[in-house]
UniProtKB/Swiss-Prot annotation:
It comes from Geobacillus kaustophilus (strain HTA426). GTP binds at residues 165-172, 190-194, 212-215, 282-285, 310-312. It is an enzyme of class 3 (hydrolase). GO terms for molecular function: GTP binding; GTPase activity; magnesium ion binding. An essential GTPase which binds GTP, GDP and possibly (p)ppGpp with moderate affinity, with high nucleotide exchange rates and a fairly low GTP hydrolysis rate. Plays a role in control of the cell cycle, stress response, ribosome biogenesis and in those bacteria that undergo differentiation, in morphogenesis control. GO terms for cellular component: cytoplasm. This is GTPase Obg. Residues 159-329 form the OBG-type G domain. Mg(2+) binds at S172, T192. GO terms for biological process: ribosome biogenesis.
């Protein structure tokens, strides 16, 4: 089974904690602070592996967490930085932020890397906090939390040739006879629920990847049936092979089928109609096929090359494959969005609205709730087991304006303040 979209959770490693330590060596008077910094947490990195074709592996593992950095040590020894967590993805993977729907990366080339979640920096040891007024601080930071986010991975096939057509016109049968692919084949609609890939090699040694795509029905560009899933997979094919049931086994007119499918491609994305197209007039071994082919050619004219074939008996298949291989040699890729000239070096500045450092809301029990990325990060990096660290955290909140904001909201001595899963008591006349 082919999986073309999957949601996963990624988290960069937390930074290692800084250490509070002092030199205690003999004959070293006033040794001073000697606590080292923590190591950096590992990043979660996507790397394109051209040997992968599907997102199947992500069905079984959906959580990816990079290792945390090593804690700082005494004698000013820094903790070791954690190794990055490498996650391999197939070429053609689009990385989307599940919360904002923003496309973060489009990974197409072998070896291409993308850091999807950065590891946190290591916390500073007490050596970093030494000043003239406080030469022996008992302050150290906890490591910075690593980035965490929910990600949607979407895979678009990087096939050279896409087979399109109504359900049950013979696309799966054609793919099975020209490659080693073994798609499920039956005479009913929507047999091919997922794309099948096959590597095709012609007699003269040329090869290409062919995709038998899910059956298309009228209204696909609006999401009817399997339409959207089908159309996502065809976006990156360079040549379209339109398979038509020339025997009209299901009673439809072959020429009308041709018009309907092309209208769907046109409605979904204008660039799809720019791709060269070949018509594979299938089921020529069946009654009425010859007469239907004659009428079809009269209506189509020279607009598109038509190759009469029978996938079941392999009649005409060899000539079709040679024509496809010839066309691929002269057909460039068709990007859906205009690409900029790579010679033009351009820096893009993206405006992102600055979020407030904190927000204050009121709980039903009267407690004040503090929230915000900046204030939560400060909280997580504070070592509350040490009095000096607690005082430093209180000073940081005061400098951010938290105290004044709480007073404006009506906070009084003894009121409960919540931050994450912790509760504090508001002291209006706190003395540094």
């Amino acid at each position: 089974m082919f999986v073309d979209q999957v949601k996963i959770y990624v988290k960069g490693g937390d930074g290692g904690n800084g250490m509070v330590a002092f030199r205690r060596e003999k004959y070293v008077p006033k040794g001073g602070p000697a606590g080292g910094d923590g190591g950096k947490g590992g990043d979660v990195v996507f790397v394109v592996d051209e040997g992968l074709r599907t997102l199947m592996d992500f069905r079984y593992q959906r959580h990816f967490k990079a290792p945390r950095g090593e804690n700082g040590m005494s004698k000013n020894q820094h903790g070791k930085n954690a190794e990055d967590l490498i996650v391999k993805v197939p070429p053609g993977t689009v990385v989307i932020d599940a919360d904002t729907n923003e496309v973060l990366a489009d990974l197409t080339e072998a070896g291409q890397r993308f850091v999807v979640a950065k590891g946190g920096r290591g916390g500073r040891g007490n050596t970093r906090f030494a000043t003239a007024s406080n030469p022996a601080p008992e302050i150290a930071e906890n490591g910075e939390p690593g980035e965490e986010r929910n990600i949607i991975l979407e895979l678009k096939l990087l096939a050279d040739v896409g087979l399109v057509g109504f359900p049950s016109v013979g696309k799966s049968t054609l793919l099975s006879v020209v490659s080693a692919a073994r798609p499920k084949i039956a005479e009913y609609h929507f047999t091919t629920l997922v794309p099948n890939l096959g590597v095709v090699e012609t007699e003269d040694g040329r090869s290409f990847v062919m995709a038998d795509l899910p059956g298309l029905i009228e209204g696909a560009h609006q999401g009817v049936g399997l339409g959207h899933q089908f159309l996502r997979h065809i976006e990156r094919t360079r040549v379209i092979v339109h398979v038509i049931d020339m025997a009209a086994v299901e009673g439809r007119d072959p020429y009308n089928d041709y018009l309907v499918i092309n209208e769907e491609l046109k409605q979904y994305n204008l660039r799809l109609t720019e791709r060269p197209q070949i018509v594979a007039a299938n089921k020529m071994d069946m009654p009425n096929a010859e007469e239907n082919l004659r009428r079809f050619k009269e209506k189509v004219g020279d607009a598109v090359p038509v190759f009469p074939i029978s996938a079941a008996t392999r009649q005409g298949v060899r000539e079709l494959l040679f024509a496809i291989a010839d066309l691929l040699e002269t057909t460039p890729e068709f990007p859906l969005h205009e690409r900029e000239d790579p010679a033009v070096q351009r820096v893009v500045y993206k405006y992102e609205k600055e979020e407030p450092p904190f927000t204050i809301t009121r709980a039903s029990d009267g407690a004040f709730i503090l929230a915000g990325d900046k204030i939560e990060k400060l909280f997580k990096m504070t070592d509350f087991s040490r009095e000096e660290s607690v005082r430093r955290f209180a000073r940081q909140l005061k400098a951010m304006g938290v105290d004044d904001a709480l007073r404006e909201r009506g906070a009084k001595d003894g009121d409960t303040i919540r931050l994450l899963d912790y509760e504090f008591e508001f002291v209006d006349d706190w003395d540094e």
